[in-house]
Swiss-Prot record:
It comes from the Eukaryota. Usually encoded in the trnK tRNA gene intron. Probably assists in splicing its own and other chloroplast group II introns. It is found in: Plastid, Chloroplast. It comes from Coronilla varia. This is Maturase K.
């Protein structure tokens, strides 16, 4: 944020009126592609492969200035094209500029809203994706039904631009944005093919992610608005971070549309006990009441996507299941619901009796098969989980080889330490440990047995199992009973903000 504010010396009260000129400033593209504006390498033409030079950006901005974008005609579309020379390359540069401009605006609004609400510290903890699992563990005893929802995508980009205009007031900026998308994505057709969306998202990753996140934020804001209206209790776990133009008027109109089919029924089934969790393109809706209320929310989502976003969604894509009999994959874990039966023996005077207690539980398990496939793809083992050596690392020093394996092992252990069953995690560590030994033996042109015999012991590789224990001992008292309890219990880390399979096995 400090870097953005350094380049954008705008009055906060009028920032929304000055987005259009920012698109024609060179430093915006420098921020978009992480270039230092004071370095000479940004001024030089550094070759065809690394094309993001200041000279090319200047030429593109000059061409955008000279073209007349006020009129779009179907007859002379080739004469007045927004992207003429290298369509994919020009779109990457321009979309990066668009993305950084809107990100700056929304970041400033979000930070100011958080400062006013004084929830910055708790917000940072809630950003961690691992905060979802303790939430599930705390609430699972009260929940009966769960709905697994896949957020439909893609939608027509024109709809996104129209919705975005309710947040930002700068009309020229949106005219330029619409013209760019019109030229690049072929808006002459009513339906944009998935191939075009894939090409656009691949070449313009940053801008595509912003549009997708904005789309999800928009439909969730409507969902939480109606959720608040249909509840006796005030909703405390959600806050609108951004000031919205015509917000309540638009939501009020949406309520009137569904008043016959949806809202009047919800008025009868008043229940505040609904929990909603989302990460990436997957959402989970859970409730304690009968499935009839869940069915109402299910059809609400379908009508919302179809009527408000023009996205077709089949009712069969949203499933309602009983939590005690349901299992699903979420954020790299395998979550399995069930019932835990306990028998307590009691005695009153001379009479003894047994009390049978049934408690709902949620097992959070490490999915061993997908992780083995991931390790096999990276050549640490085969598809059966048998460790392999890494000949490509044989040129490194012994210290670097061990450090790389330790870093990968630490990443996996850090992420999956919240598992209720640690046996699968220990197996993953075992695979990496033997792969490290085989790599060292391959480097020294020896067998594994001879290499270990020459070392005399395996103390060199004990760090695979002792490093995590040393870290935990800095936080908790180092007693045998405490360490045994830590190995058995789940530990969630609140410093994990995203999940990516490639990052888990990344040695950098």
């Amino acid at each position: 944020m400090e870097e953005y504010q350094l380049y954008l010396e705008l009055d906060r009260s009028r920032q929304q009126d000055f987005l259009y000129p920012l698109v024609f400033h060179e430093y915006v593209y420098g921020l978009a592609y992480s270039h230092d504006l004071n370095r000479s390498i940004f001024v030089e033409n550094i070759g065809y492969d690394n094309k993001y030079s200041l000279l090319i950006v200047k030429r593109l901005i000059t061409r955008m200035y000279r073209q007349n974008h006020l009129i779009i005609s179907a007859n002379d579309s080739n004469k007045n094209r927004f992207l003429r020379y290298n369509k994919n390359f020009d779109s990457q540069i321009i979309s990066g500029g668009f993305a950084i401009v809107v990100e700056i605006l929304f970041s400033l609004q979000l930070s100011s809203s958080l400062e006013e609400a004084e929830i910055i510290k708790s917000y940072k903890n809630l950003r961690s994706i691992h905060s979802i699992f303790p939430f599930f563990e705390d609430k699972v005893t009260y929940l009966n039904y769960i709905s697994d929802i896949q957020v439909p995508y893609p939608i027509h980009l024109e709809i996104l631009v129209q919705i975005l205009r309710y947040w930002v007031k700068d009309a020229p900026f949106f005219h330029l944005l619409r013209l760019f998308l019109y030229d690049y994505c072929n808006w002459n057709s009513i339906i944009i093919p998935k191939k075009s969306i894939y090409t656009f998202s691949k070449n313009n990753t940053r801008f595509f992610f912003f549009l997708y996140n904005f789309y999800v934020c928009e439909y969730e804001s409507i969902f939480f608005f109606l959720r608040t209206q249909s509840s006796h209790l005030r909703l405390k776990s959600f806050r609108f971070f951004f000031e919205r133009i015509f917000f309540y008027a638009k939501k009020g109109h949406l309520v009137e549309v569904f008043v016959k089919d949806f809202f009047s029924t919800l008025t009868f089934f008043k229940d505040p006990f609904i929990h909603y969790v989302r990460y990436q393109g997957k959402s989970i809706l859970a409730s304690k009441n009968l499935p009839i209320l869940m069915n109402k929310w299910k059809y609400y989502f379908i009508h919302l996507w179809q009527c408000y976003f023009d996205v077709w969604s089949q009712p069969g894509t949203i499933h309602i299941n009983q939590l005690s009999e349901y299992s699903f994959h979420f954020l790299g874990y395998f979550l399995k619901g069930g019932l835990k039966h306990s028998v307590v023996r009691g005695q009153m005077l001379q009479k003894g009796f047994l009390i049978k207690i049934i408690i709902k539980k949620l097992d959070i398990i490490v999915p061993i098969i997908p992780i083995i496939r991931l390790l096999a793809k990276a050549k640490f083992c085969n598809v059966l989980g048998n460790p392999l050596s890494k000949p490509s690392w044989a040129d490194l020093s012994d210290f670097d080889i061990i450090a790389r394996f330790l870093r990968i092992c630490r990443n996996l252990s850090h992420y999956y330490n919240g598992s209720s069953k640690k046996k699968s995690l220990y197996r993953i560590k075992y695979i990496l440990r033997l792969s490290c030994i085989k790599t060292l033996a391959c480097k020294h042109k020896s067998t594994v047995r001879a290499f270990l015999k020459r070392l005399g012991s395996e103390e060199l590789l004990e760090e695979f199992f002792t490093e995590e224990e040393e870290i935990l001992s800095l936080i908790f008292p180092r007693t045998p009973s405490t360490l045994r309890r830590l190995h058995r219990n789940r530990i969630w880390y609140l410093d994990i903000f995203f999940s990516n399979d490639n990052d888990l096995i990344n040695h950098d």
